Curated annotation (Swiss-Prot):
Its EC number is 4.2.1.41. It catalyses: 5-dehydro-4-deoxy-D-glucarate + H(+) = 2,5-dioxopentanoate + CO2 + H2O. This is Probable 5-dehydro-4-deoxyglucarate dehydratase. Pathway: Carbohydrate acid metabolism; D-glucarate degradation; 2,5-dioxopentanoate from D-glucarate: step 2/2. The keyword Magnesium does not apply.
Amino acid sequence: MSKMTPQEMAAKIGSGLLSFPVTPFKADYSFDEATYRANMDWLCGYEVAGLFAAGGTGEFFSLTPAEVPEVVRVAVDETRGRVPVLAGTGYGTAIAREIAIGAEKAGADGLLLLPPYLTHAEQDGLAAHVEAVCKSVKIGVIVYNRDNAILQPDTLARLCERCPNLVGYKDGIGDIELMTRVYSKMGDRLTYIGGLPTAETFALPYLDMGVTTYSSAVFNFVPEFATNFYAAVRKRDHATIHAGLKDFILPLIAIRNRKKGYAVSIIKAGMKVIGRDSGPVRLPLTDLTETEMAELTALVKALPAAAVSQAAE
């Protein structure tokens, strides 16, 4: 069980960069625990405020409800309290509660509640879903606002009154007006996380709206670059930010956007580039082609030597 209160967890994750480690798979697509342990230990050597086990980049959507707590257990065991570990949960309410309870027992410090699977619902239904998950555990919960689960400010306010352990709001839609209204309504009651794909692209404008942190997928394979970029965002170092976007992030996005599902596939490909092969993505996702792998390799090698050499250690 976590030793952190929901409020302590929220304060911690709001203080620095966040990331979602990939979930390594063997050739037969089974969980590769040894590689996962090695990756988690390595990532803990960098300045990161929280790691999300079995999150979106960790292919939560392809893990079974039984696998998620197991992945979380390994993450908690390997990090040894060096960094908070949060777990993904989602699908329908019953399954989301089941995964949440299992993750809490496995030692997770918090939860990221992903949208219900393919279900569109009214605000009252979404609120009841979030409340049911929050009340099934004692650890802190972060709600992921995206796709078919977009909570409006008034709904969030009611939920925060009813659920003291609802402590975070992750934005995955990029609606500036909605984000402004949410922050104006809730203020410091919640910790705000930028959660758009390749969140570095939106990090600076979001900072001015109270979003002090974001989830960096590229931290998986170029952690030195990711942490330096985050530091530049916090300092509002426009020159460093725009150089990082131009030289690495935007070319990476160009490869990612070629095919559906590459937001995850390209991160696993990056792990392979730096010598930390974490296996294939699970179906229905597909891996990068040889040509795309070559392009990604060249992009990573073009980074400053310090970022590449430290990433490959």
